[in-house]
Amino acid sequence: MPNKKILVTCALPYANGPLHIGHMLEHIQADIWVRYQRMKNNEVYFICADDAHGTAIMLKSKQLNINPEIMIAKIQQEHYQDCCDFNISYNNYHSTHSEENYELLNSIYTKLKKSGFIKSRFISQLYDAQNNIFLPDRFIIGTCPKCRAHNQNGDNCDQCGAIYTPLDLINPKSAISGKSPIIKKSKHLFFDLPQFTKSLYTWIHSGVLQEETLHKVKEWFKLGLKEWDISRNEPYFGFKIPNTSSKYFYVWMDAPIGYMGTFKNLCKKNKNILFEDFWSINSKVELYHFIGKDITYFHSLFWPAILESCQYRKPTGIFVHGHVTLNGSKISKSKNNFINVRTYLSHLNSDYLRYYYATKLSSKINDIDLNFNDFMLKVNADIINKILNLASRNSNFITQYNYGYLSNSLENSNLYDFFIDAQYLIGKLFQQREFSEAMRKIMQLADKANQYIDKQAPWHIVKQHGIHNKNIALCIFSMGIQLFRVLVIYLKPVLPILSQYSEKFLNTRLSWNNINIPLTNHKINKFDIIFHRINTNQISSIINK
């Protein structure tokens, strides 16, 4: 019987171009956690979708001279394939440009309006007169009014985290034309976020946020919550607001609702899953959002307020991570400091990046640097030299001289107990998303396993003739395989390709439930080398793309 029901989401990739390896950090982090939960017999549903609306998509499709619906459908398939090839175990990968999202969005908006949470008023906006378009926040570039950092977007500063309006920006420019925009008035619709100040303040202190996130969110409360503009003027690609002639829902109105729309789509595919069980206000299901630090405001304030106002449940936890830097510098397409997922996959195994990110990830919100020299050294040292070498050096004798059968007893039961006792600490670290520390503990065990084999030196015992000596050597080699099995069980949430291969090699399913039971008198298969050391040529090919 499953212990718990859990719904996990990743933030929705934007459907205006290919994914780069920085994007994969979140998908990998969430997938490791999800795979661990499934190994512990929890019933987990893991979903994501493409964020498929907004001015950026409209402009991109114009630039490519393609219908935006055709463009987002193509990109959605590319994103999904990238996730599949990184073995991200989604139960459903959908799109916000869907029937389910449209229905939920309109239903929620109607409830908000009926409850008096939608206000309307005229506001001053920046307008690109050359292109006849009101400029979205992300299409206005200027200097942050708080820290004076240059080249910041019109809604928030990625240097100091300040939240502001485009009119607050110093020396704003249109990112479309490069010209200084003019100020123009327009009527907009607002969600009355301040109405939820008290309930949100209580909720953020209920343990749903990391300590670092909580401190940041409390700063926004000190400044005072503001009404949230949920409308955009045409031209725009998205869903029209009911009973308006030229207004569309702001992308950040329909994007979080995309979590619900994607799950509703999954319910259509699987009639045994009931939408209300997961989203009703009294739901006992645990709901977790994995997100990047730059979208904390939307998920910690705007989104739970929308859910509360419509009598839906709020998230159990919001797990925020930092950004990925590449060789010490911010990932930037304009500066050619980025690597697309497809480029990486054309040269290297996805397990390698999954492992490297795991060695860097924790429950903190620190940025993670992908240094390719460190990446190569760590993967070669840990996965190749420590883990796979343990299987390789111990399996040959067993398959050649004992028909693949492991010995019928453990050579060192105390050592085996030491390895399986680590499951409690390692499991706790996985549960708390302290993957870096979990990898460190696992590699300490790998070192201990290899030291045991080095000290016993069964290859020397084999050279001493006699059945007795061969049996002693068999027990030692078998012990090495027993320890390898425990290690790959611990690594299974991180390395799906390696664990799948190891299950074929060991001729058994790798399960946390039977880790205590060794494979005595058990037949294994021949060990084949499917993982290879990373070399500098491969790294150069990726970097130079």
Swiss-Prot record:
In its UniProt entry, the species of origin is given as Blochmanniella floridana
What is the free-text note on the cofactor? Binds 1 zinc ion per subunit.
Q: What is this protein called?
A: Methionine--tRNA ligase
Q: Using the UniProt record, name the top-level EC class of this enzyme in a single word.
A: ligase
Q: Which InterPro entries does this chain map to? A: aa-tRNA-synth_I_CS, Met-tRNA_ligase_1, Met-tRNA_synth, Methionyl/Leucyl_tRNA_Synth, MetRS_core, MetRS_Zn, Rossmann-like_a/b/a_fold, tRNAsynth_Ia_anticodon-bd
Reported cofactor(s): Zn(2+)
Molecular function per GO: ATP binding; metal ion binding; methionine-tRNA ligase activity
Report keywords, A-Z: Aminoacyl-tRNA synthetase, ATP-binding, Cytoplasm, Ligase, Metal-binding, Nucleotide-binding, Protein biosynthesis, Zinc
Under which EC number(s) is this enzyme classified? 6.1.1.10
On subunit structure and binding partners, the annotation says: Monomer.
Q: Which family does it belong to?
A: Belongs to the class-I aminoacyl-tRNA synthetase family. MetG type 1 subfamily.
Report if keyword Cell wall biogenesis/degradation is assigned.
Answer: no
Catalytic activity, as annotated: tRNA(Met) + L-methionine + ATP = L-methionyl-tRNA(Met) + AMP + diphosphate
Name a single GO cellular component.
cytosol
> According to its UniProt record, where is this protein mainly located?
cytoplasm
Q: Which GO terms describe its biological process?
A: methionyl-tRNA aminoacylation
Residues annotated for Zn(2+) binding in this entry: 144, 147, 157, 160
